[in-house]
């Protein structure tokens, strides 16, 4: 027999698929269940009550100890609820499959909202659900291409070009360093630079890193185009879990340009000077090692601007990989200029 309280207990009640929430007063669990079913026009048989917070079922035994103003959920036969986790799951499903109704509702709420924090949350929600991620061509998503040259006809092509441009920029920096190399070693420096250039051309300047249509081993994103921040150079991962999909909309494309391909072992401070020093030493340089440090994911991390630390990394190249193993005769070293000998003074007779 269910316990009947002398004074009614007031709770806030909602149904699983309803955004409405009502205050209901009842002296027993069964009375509350019956009133809730009437309010939401649901069948009583098979229905039950649970705590909205964690999904704990409300029974006759625990009803008397239920605090006033508790938030309860009314479930019908076959429905389940696991607390806030269920609400978060439902919210995430909106991001995967946005509906016009959700977008319209978010816009309406945003237009009426005055609180800055709620405005921010609604704006972020609207930004994400409005993305046209699956679209690829200019015809399918013309707004994404606003401000871009007409030669770019699809998103993957532009993102590939964007990555290639970054890698080409690194190559120009390596080339510009030749002025710092001794004149006797410049020919060898140019030879190494030429080898790197040919290698980059063969892999299309690693533009596949930003291309969601590339092979999984050659890209830094998911097949849908989601990129995750790999964290600062001195951490294994991003503690803030930054992520972005530049394929989604124009704003995301522009924001993605602020993300950095950061060299773990620094390019300007360490890698290029070490390369120049090794060439000037006269031994045969393992240029493929330096290539991997300068232009590949072996030494590059994709990072959100907040995770891009501008401090000195204080990391050095692997000395065991700088030169090729000497299997035969050592490559002839470039001649070094010797200081002129001073003649001894003649003795006066």
From Swiss-Prot:
Its EC number is 3.-.-.-. Pfam families: CIDE-N, DFF40. GO terms for molecular function: disordered domain specific binding; DNA binding; DNA endonuclease activity; DNA nuclease activity; enzyme binding; identical protein binding; nuclease activity; protein domain specific binding. Inhibited by DFFA (DFF45). Residues 7-83 form the CIDE-N domain. PROSITE patterns: CIDE_N. Keywords: Apoptosis, Cytoplasm, Hydrolase, Nuclease, Nucleus. It is found in: Cytoplasm; Nucleus. Residues 319-349 are annotated as: Disordered. GO terms for biological process: apoptotic chromosome condensation; apoptotic DNA fragmentation; DNA catabolic process; negative regulation of apoptotic DNA fragmentation. InterPro entries: CIDE-N_dom, DFF40, DFF40_C, His-Me_finger_sf. Residues 329-349 have a biased composition (Basic residues). GO terms for cellular component: chromatin; cytosol; nucleus; protein-containing complex. Nuclease that induces DNA fragmentation and chromatin condensation during apoptosis. Degrades naked DNA and induces apoptotic morphology. Heterodimer of DFFA and DFFB. Interacts with H1-1. This is DNA fragmentation factor subunit beta.
